[in-house]
Amino acid sequence: MLWEKVMFIANNKYKLVTKYKPSGDQNQAIEKLNKAIIENKKHQVLLGATGTGKTFTIANIIAKHNKQALVIAHNKTLAMQLYYELKEMFPENRVEYFVSNFDFFQPEAYIPSKDLYIDKDSRQNMELDMMRLSACNALLTRNDTIVVASVAALFALQNPLEYSSAFIELKVGQKIKRNELLTWLVRSGYTRNDIENQLGSFSAKGDVVKIVPGWVNNIMFRISLFDDEIESIHTLNTITNSILDNITTVTIHPAQSYITPQDKLKTICNNIRNELVQRLAELQSENKLLEAQRLEQRTKYDLESLEEFGFCSGIENYSSHLDFRSKGQRPYVLLDYFNNDFITIVDESHITLPQIRGMYNTDRSRKLTLVEYGFRLPSALDNRPLNFDEFNSLIKQVIYTSATPGDYELDLVNHQVVQQIIRPTGLLDPQIEIRKTTNQIDDIINEIHLRKLQNERVFITTLTIRMSEDLTAFLQEKNIKVAYLHSELKTLERSEILNDLRKGVYDVVVGVNLLREGLDLPEVSLVCILDADKQGFLRNYRSLIQTIGRVARNVNGKAIMYADTVSQAMDEAIKETNRRRKIQEEFNKKHNIVPKTISKAISESILSEQTKKTLAKAKKIKDKKQKLQTIQQTIDNLRQEMLQAAKELDFERAAILRDTIIELENEKNTN
């Protein structure tokens, strides 16, 4: 991130930078979406087949309307992918990333049946925390801001008015006492560190104050004072300490997203005490003396910490008091940081919307138990994610994107969707065949051999783990190079299997759920769906369409459904695929397009050889201390590789490395 981007610029325009022009049916999709936005329609659905360039279409919409934009994805990996794609297309604008800032998070919980209290355990990721702060700051200072977020965007943040009131603008010639500046820095979450330039820290030597902001990498500000007046402001590189620029003004934002307002701290603590007195009376009247004692002890300890330091462990549980919200009032969230005219894009809406719906009830159920048994005050219930109705009340105009939109979003638009099913590569939706289950395994083996002759690969999806294990073992007995992809595999192992499938180390991968990200491999030309006619999540219409789409990147893409009857879901999926395929064929014929398999480079390995050796070494070490040191060394190596992958815009590898780091951190914590 360039240092200039931390400066206040009120109303920049988006500039889409790309060597591509809209092709296929992207133009008509862009026109229809644009028209609906101009007409102020709240809901739109972009039904985009796999590989048709939905992100590119959305980028054109954002650029045309110059509105702040929120893009919500259902997990960190997809959010990271979208972030890097949009960042590449909008290099001169603010593209931000907002996900959970924890590498590891175990929420506070109590299990009454076992009388087991589980304390909150977490490991914060400073890099992600920095990116969250950057997103908040950008939304409050820049019109040309795109934030790519997970559902973390729906969890509680500080009131944006309170947060922005903590901004301080420093100018050359401004009168300010050194102690006033240092006091503001401490109250805004900065920590003093005269030795190391850490994110969210400051140093003070004589009349020179150096501030390392918490929202941008490798940059710090040197404020030189003379006789209670700012004499000069310089931007410096935090690593080399070299001067980057001499500036006249800078806006410094808080180092944390939750800042306790000092002038209101006394009132906040009194309000917490009043609630405590009321709740203790309730518990004592119900003869819950143990719960009352527990609550009093815990809350008073938190109050002492709040009054002394302006902070306490689990401060988020007092967020309604910090924000002066009434009981039941919704929390402030990232959406409150947007201006009054922003656009929302819900990616993979058939997955993301159900996830948003479920968050509130899951969170409330856990916290009700904590309140009932005296671990938390009732106001802790108001530290929560938005419920679905609240989310809907905050979004202005929204585009739902999916290859298989859900019934909810389809009903919102009366099934009048904007279609985008022509691929720039000319690739057609896969052919589909239905075959009887009699001798199905022999038939699959024959298909595997045919694909192997063409140097192509095969996916096989079953309904149960047992079926996958048995089928994998049987194929191995037949000397077929096969791997089993299951949920217990660690991120790195899963990625290495898929990489080896592409290389030809394996010819087949067997699994239960082949709907996860990272499975769109151009070498895979056949997907075999066992028990295709059975009812359930993995064999409903949307899952079948998504599974068929696993082979849509190969010109010979084909799906074989093994079933003795044709279920309604099968019938709908086949009809929809054939409908799309017909449109695609007609378009190719009209424009003389010859479909071709997507070309995608195969990386030699996700990990460097050095990191592989260190990881293998760690597994063999029995001494606990030495093992922890080796794991930490591996984590440090992986962080370097992850940052390098991010710089090279290899977001798939960067995401895999990040997940591997999280797994190793968890392993280190349990040793």
From Swiss-Prot:
Q: Which residues form the Helicase C-terminal domain?
A: 440-602
Query: What GO cellular component term, any one, is given?
Result: excinuclease repair complex
Task: Point out the coiled-coil segments of this chain.
Answer: none
Q: Which residues form the Helicase ATP-binding domain?
A: 35-423
Which positions bind ATP?
G48, A49, T50, G51, T52, G53, K54, T55
Matches recorded under InterPro entries: Helicase/UvrB_N, Helicase_ATP-bd, Helicase_C-like, P-loop_NTPase, UVR_dom, UVR_dom_sf, UvrB, UvrB_inter
Q: Where is the UVR domain?
A: 632-667
Q: What GO molecular function annotation could you give as one example from this UniProt entry?
A: excinuclease ABC activity
Instruction: Extract the Pfam families matched here.
Output: Helicase_C, ResIII, UVR, UvrB, UvrB_inter
Q: Which UniProt keywords apply?
A: ATP-binding, Cytoplasm, DNA damage, DNA excision, DNA repair, Excision nuclease, Nucleotide-binding, SOS response
Motif window: Beta-hairpin: 101-124
In terms of SMART domains, this protein maps to: DEXDc (SM00487), HELICc (SM00490)
Give the NCBIfam families listed for this entry.
Answer: PRK05298.1, uvrb
Task: Return the PANTHER family for the record.
Answer: UVRABC SYSTEM PROTEIN B
Q: Could you tell me what this protein does?
A: The UvrABC repair system catalyzes the recognition and processing of DNA lesions. A damage recognition complex composed of 2 UvrA and 2 UvrB subunits scans DNA for abnormalities. Upon binding of the UvrA(2)B(2) complex to a putative damaged site, the DNA wraps around one UvrB monomer. DNA wrap is dependent on ATP binding by UvrB and probably causes local melting of the DNA helix, facilitating insertion of UvrB beta-hairpin between the DNA strands. Then UvrB probes one DNA strand for the presence of a lesion.
| Free-text comment about domains | The beta-hairpin motif is involved in DNA binding.
Q: Which family does it belong to?
A: Belongs to the UvrB family.
Write down what this protein is called.
UvrABC system protein B
